[in-house]
């Protein structure tokens, strides 16, 4: 059985990147929450 995590920078950016987050209302809420919390990295 293969491992479930097969790293890919492109897929990671497309699924969890800044533009992917900002594309939806809920994604914008995630970024806003992380900003309020003071996270150094907002998205992947």
UniProtKB/Swiss-Prot annotation:
Keywords assigned: Ribonucleoprotein, Ribosomal protein
Q: Where is the signal peptide?
A: none
InterPro entries per record: Ribosomal_bL34
Glycoprotein recorded as keyword: no
Report one GO cellular component: ribonucleoprotein complex
In which domain of life is the source organism classified?
A: Bacteria
Please name the GO terms that the record assigns under molecular function.
structural constituent of ribosome
GO biological process annotation, one example: translation
- Asked if the record carries the keyword Ribonucleoprotein, the reply is yes
Q: Which PANTHER family match?
A: LARGE RIBOSOMAL SUBUNIT PROTEIN BL34M, MITOCHONDRIAL RIBOSOMAL PROTEIN 34 FAMILY MEMBER
Into which family does the record put it? Belongs to the bacterial ribosomal protein bL34 family.
Protein name per UniProt: Large ribosomal subunit protein bL34
Q: Give the species this sequence originates from.
A: Caulobacter sp. (strain K31)
Q: Which gene encodes it?
A: rpmH
């Amino acid at each position: 059985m293969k491992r479930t995590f097969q790293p890919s920078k492109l897929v990671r950016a497309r699924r969890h990147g800044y533009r992917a987050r900002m594309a939806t209302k809920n994604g914008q809420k995630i970024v806003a929450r992380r900003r309020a919390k003071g996270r150094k990295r907002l998205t992947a």
